[in-house]
Amino acid sequence: MSSLPSSRRTAGDTWAITESVGATALGVAAARAVETAATNPLIRDEFAKVLVSSAGTAWARLADADLAWLDGDQLGRRVHRVACDYQAVRTHFFDEYFGAAVDAGVRQVVILAAGLDARAYRLNWPAGTVVYEIDQPSVLEYKAGILQSHGAVPTARRHAVAVDLRDDWPAALIAAGFDGTQPTAWLAEGLLPYLPGDAADRLFDMVTALSAPGSQVAVEAFTMNTKGNTQRWNRMRERLGLDIDVQALTYHEPDRSDAAQWLATHGWQVHSVSNREEMARLGRAIPQDLVDETVRTTLLRGRLVTPAQPA
């Protein structure tokens, strides 16, 4: 297989939940588990801990709210706590997005690269809501199997769409029942860094083409802080034995499209906020001495105002 630029990824690579990109879903879910166990959590994901702990002992330790795996490392504990705060804030942002979308009458949801996202189980969806989850087959199978074994029941009609987003996912989505005549609430959370820039542009092209009037989109756009991310994941590797190298899994082309600008020039009315602003608004401001250790992102919400023209 040929190598893809600015990453150690390879064309057509796949992964199980504890491997490669799949393992990052465990790391994110572990942060949601930590937040859920807090005294005054911003979000509640009662499924996060079991999804993470079922992957093995080291992962279970990562999901423990006391962060005991970082004992003796005060800086590491503070940095990881801020990272968990950010995951809580971004989850809250997108939970609110879905709430506003269904309040506006949207009843069709597509979660791109769903990973261990449990919104189809934990949010209170209106009757008739359909949630499509797109991801690698092994990731979707892992999540569904664990949740089923613990008696979890979806709160919407859930459809797993097992397909790689670098492949013909629109065909798979339509085959699963997606209705292109109905407005859709799309979500791309924690996804873009794991796609080459041209693949990200194609993804947005396809989302726009599939969107009926009234559709909405939410996106997490990254400006990767290489130093902070690398050091945090290195701590997980050194202390827990988790073999994850996020730097090697992500793409860093300097000429990638700006997600907000792309959407705005393709018929979407976009509102954005930086993660730092949103964290401060929700009482989770980043300590000044840790700013350089923290990921930089922009959280976007968009509404389709110019319907896509048929091909």
UniProtKB/Swiss-Prot annotation:
A single MF term (Gene Ontology): methyltransferase activity
Residues involved in S-adenosyl-L-methionine binding: 135, 164-165
Organism phylogeny: Bacteria, Bacillati, Actinomycetota, Actinomycetes, Mycobacteriales
Record's keyword annotation contains S-adenosyl-L-methionine: yes
Organism: Mycobacterium tuberculosis (strain ATCC 25177 / H37Ra)
Family, per entry: Belongs to the UPF0677 family.
Keyword check for Cytoplasm: no
Record key words, sorted: Methyltransferase, S-adenosyl-L-methionine, Transferase
Protein's job: Exhibits S-adenosyl-L-methionine-dependent methyltransferase activity.
EC number: 2.1.1.-
A single BP term in Gene Ontology: methylation
Protein name in the entry: Putative S-adenosyl-L-methionine-dependent methyltransferase MRA_0152
